[in-house]
Every structure is written in C-alpha cells, then in structure tokens.
From Swiss-Prot:
The gene is RNF144A. Zn(2+) 2 binds at residues 111, 116, 135, 138. Signal peptide: none annotated. It comes from Homo sapiens. Its main location: membrane. Changing residue 252 to L: Preserves membrane localization but is defective in self-association and ubiquitin ligase activity. GO terms for cellular component: cytoplasm; endoplasmic reticulum membrane; endosome membrane; Golgi apparatus; intracellular membrane-bounded organelle; plasma membrane; ubiquitin ligase complex. This is E3 ubiquitin-protein ligase RNF144A.
Length: 292
C-alpha cells in the first residue's frame, strides 16, 4: 500500500524565487532560462526580448550573455536561440550569420550586381593583385578588388564607387547620388541600405557614424552641427524641436560631468597630500635595515 505525503498549501508560497539580472524581478525557476555556456540565468521573457532586439537590428551574429559582468563571457548557442524566437526571426538570424561569414571569408565575395546578390568564389585566394571573378548566377565578370566590371591591363580607380541604384551594376555606380538607396560605408566599404529615417547613419560592421548624403564622418559631432550648414542643412530627417532636445541632453550630460568634477576637486586636493605621505612612509619603512 502506497501513501502520499500531505504537503500543506502554505508551503507552496515558500518555493524559492530567482532574480532576473535584466528586469530585477523575481520569478519561479520554471519562468527562467539558463544559458548553457556560462550558466547565467534570466527570466525567459527578458532573454527573448533581448535576443529578438539584437537580431531585428542586425547588431550581432554571436549573441553574448546579457550580463556585462559575466565571468565566462558566454554566448547563446543556435539551438537555444531557435527555442525562444519565431521562425521568421530565426531565418533572419541565419541570414545575418551567413552574410558575416561571406564578409570575412577571403575565398568568397558578393556579386556587385544589385539584381543578383549571389556569392562568388575567388579562383586564386593567394593572389594579392586584382583578379577577374565571374558570377555563376548572372554571368557578370567583375574585379575582385574594386567590384567594377573586369578591366584587364588597367588599374582599379583610386576612388572606390560608393553608391548605386537598383537595377544597375557596379559599372554604372553613382558617385554623388543623394537619392541612392544603397551606399558603401566610407570606412569599411560594406554595402548599407537605407529605407527611411534620419540621415545620421552608423555602420553595423565597423560602428562608424557618417552623414548619408555627403558621407562625412559624424563620429565626433555629438551635437549634429553638420546639419546646420552646408549642402546637408536641414536634411537630418528630424524636427527642429527633437534636434534641440537631443542637444540639450548632450550638453546636460557634459555639464553634469563637469559639475561633478568641480565638486570633487577640493576633496581630491585634500586627499593628495595624505596619499603622498602614506606612500613616503611605506617607502621609508622598506628602506630601513632589519635589526640584527
């Protein structure tokens, strides 16, 4: 005869809760997900939103643990990602992963024809000079270095083409076309497509910030002064009020940091002699001969 041990109902409320490092909420273990590589644990909802955001924005292909202080610097495996996102998001993740593999593979390159987008194989990987590459899909023959139509006996142009329009090959690239929907990053030359939004662009590959219209660097232009003058004036794509609010926030951050430094400077001046005195005493104690 088997007996079942009775468990009081009030014991159910004493089940341990686990804290999520993302939302700081406490949840039962059943609502948590553990990353296999580093054993960090988060609530399933937060981890799912984190993974979906990175994939939708195309920020990362190797999705790292959300904990910045993770001792093992773990990453989510593909099967873990597949269990928590929808099929279309997983398809986008695999596409981004493949694009990154081709980008860093010296044996492969993309066909520059905007209507093709096939992956082409380089014949001689060890060859340092430009070589002809023929796309097996559209049969276009192009240069492995500048991606223009193959030019035997001629060097590559000094200025690499940076924009092109849909339906055109790299031989018909536009150099100063403001309305071109696809351009190259001025720094790493990766193709970037802009559907809509503001003209301040950031390359997802090298994190370089630049103006979409003139390709000038915006890495140090925190206040977006570039759009107050010149040919790109008022082309940012945001209202004047939002630009003023952005500048107010940036100035506030710098002013707050300066104020903090100003308040802390007297304490630093007072503490400096004390620190120097302690160091002198320590060095003097090390130099004293040992008693015999």
């Amino acid at each position: 005869m088997t007996t079942t041990r009775y468990r009081p109902t009030w014991d159910l409320a004493l089940d341990p809760l686990v804290s999520c490092k993302l939302c700081l909420g406490e949840y039962p273990v059943e609502q948590m997900t553990t990353i296999a590589q580093c054993q960090c644990i988060f609530c399933t909802l937060c981890l799912k939103q984190y993974v979906e955001l990175l994939i939708k924005e195309g920020l990362e292909t190797a999705i790292s643990c959300p904990d910045a202080a993770c001792p093992k610097q773990g990453h989510l495996q593909e099967n873990e990602i597949e269990c928590m996102v929808a099929a279309e998001i997983m398809q986008r993740y695999k596409k981004l992963q493949f694009e990154r593999e081709v980008l860093f593979d010296p044996c492969r390159t993309w066909c520059p024809a905007s209507t093709c987008q096939a992956v082409c194989q380089l014949q001689d990987v060890g060859l340092q000079t430009p070589q002809p590459v023929q796309c097996k899909a559209c049969r276009m023959e192009f240069c492995s270095t500048c991606k223009a139509s193959w030019h035997p006996g001629q060097g590559c142009p000094e200025t690499m083409p940076i924009t092109f329009l849909p339906g055109e090959t790299s031989a018909a690239f536009k150099m100063e076309e403001d309305d071109a929907p696809i351009k190259r990053c001025p720094k790493c030359k990766v193709y970037i497509e802009r559907d809509e939004g503001c003209a301040q662009m950031m390359c997802k590959n090298c994190k370089h910030a630049f103006c979409w219209y003139c390709l000038e660097s915006l890495d140090d232009d925190f206040l977006l002064i570039h759009y107050d003058k010149g040919p790109c004036r008022n082309k940012l794509g945001h209202s004047r009020a939002s630009v003023i609010w952005h500048r107010t926030q940036v100035v506030g951050i710098f002013a707050g940091f300066g104020l903090l430094l100003l308040v802390a400077s007297p304490f630093l001046l007072l503490a400096t002699p004390f620190v120097l005195c302690c160091k002198c005493k320590c060095s003097k104690g090390d130099d004293d001969p040992l008693p015999t």
